[in-house]
A protein has these predicted regions:
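Conserved HGGG/HGGXW glycine-rich cap/lid loop of the alpha/beta-hydrolase fold
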Residues: 32-85
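Conserved alpha/beta-hydrolase "acid-adjacent" motif
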Residues: 240-246
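Active-site loop/oxyanion-hole signature of alpha/beta-hydrolase fold enzymes
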Residues: 78-117
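Short beta-strand/loop motif that positions the catalytic acidic residue
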Residues: 227, 233-235
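Gly/Ala-rich beta-loop-alpha elbow adjacent to hydrolase catalytic centers
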Residues: 118, 122, 126
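Hydrophobic, aromatic-rich cap/lid helix
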Residues: 193-222
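Catalytic active-site module of serine/aspartate enzymes centered on a nucleophile-bearing elbow/loop
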Residues: 257-311
């Protein structure tokens, strides 16, 4: 933990655009309240989803920057995350269930299609949306996808957390109460995301992890190879939970994709200019009018008069 906090303190702070309760909205899906926030207006719609057990706050600076460039960006908290409801039944949580929540959000907003994207859990949810409702996906932003190469890293990282949330819940709740007392006003973005992660109730957190472990993590390879939506895949080195090999594998599977290498897992939240520009340009390209294929004009052949017959 000291190492992680040291890394967070070492990176330059990014201006935090906080969401007030008045800005955030909710819709009801299967009896549960799902939280979302709209940033900007226009026809270039993009939905951004957070990482595992974090919240939509991690995407607020990116959403604000994209909105300034003419996009309508919707940040969403899936069930069990952020300001959405947090039931304790594990059967409510899976990547495919989160994909259905995204489609329900689009229905609620009367949006026929959108660019969908997110980090880690958000990236895998995006793949599930593309598998279940490809007509609703204009493009995919896939930051840190978690596929076959991440199996061991995920087991090592999240099994101890799941056990702690299940069998040491009082200790976890105590840590959460301490985190809730930290004033957020001068906390940089990465610090605020970390505090949100610590502050959460362990009971629904454990249910989320158990539900995700029980169901599939992402669409299988044969389904991924059938996806036609353009994709921007962002990977980074030195991360066993989000290995760059998974990003490379996905790039080879998706025929209409581009692979972008981030300098580190922190780049988009600490030095976001380069990646924000790439993402904004990608969304613009996804919404650009498609050029109609023009049929080649038939060549006109000069009609020749028949030669006059000799008298």
């Amino acid at each position: 933990m000291k190492l992680r906090l040291g890394v967070i303190a070492a990176v330059p702070p990014v201006a935090v655009h906080r969401i007030s309760k008045s800005q955030m909205a909710h819709f009801t899906y299967e009896g549960q309240q799902i939280a979302y926030t709209e940033h900007g207006t226009g026809r270039k719609v993009c939905v951004l989803l957070p990482g595992l057990l974090t919240s939509q706050r991690m995407h607020i600076p990116l959403a604000k920057s994209m909105a300034e460039q003419g996009s309508r960006v919707i940040t969403m908290d899936p069930l069990g995350h952020g300001d959405s409801d947090k039931p304790v039944e594990m059967w409510r949580y899976s990547m495919r269930q989160y994909a259905r929540e995204v489609v329900a959000l689009l229905d609620h907003l009367d949006v026929s299609a959108a660019v969908v994207g997110g980090a880690s859990l958000g990236a895998n949810t995006t793949l599930e949306v593309a598998a279940a409702a490809p007509e609703r996906v204009k493009g995919m932003i896939l930051e840190m996808p978690v596929l076959e190469s991440a199996l061991l890293g995920c087991a090592m990282a999240f099994t101890p957390l799941m056990c702690a949330q299940t069998f040491a819940a009082p200790v976890m709740r105590g840590a959460g109460k301490v985190a809730s007392l930290v004033p957020r006003r001068f906390i940089p973005l990465l610090g605020e995301v970390a505090l949100d992660w610590i502050e959460q109730d362990p009971a629904p957190g454990s249910a989320v992890l158990q539900g995700l472990f029980f169901d599939r993590v992402a669409p299988p390879r044969e389904e991924r190879r059938e996806m036609k939506a353009p994709a921007l895949i962002i990977g980074h080195p030195r991360d066993p939970v989000h290995p760059f090999s998974d990003a490379g594998l996905l790039s080879n599977e998706l025929e209409n994709s581009r692979l972008l290498r981030a300098n580190s897992i922190l780049e988009l939240r600490s030095r976001p200019e380069r990646l924000t520009g790439e993402i904004t340009q990608f969304v613009t390209e996804c919404w650009a009018p498609k050029k109609r294929a023009t049929k080649p004009r038939a060549r006109r052949t000069a009609s020749r008069k028949p030669a006059a017959s000799a008298a």
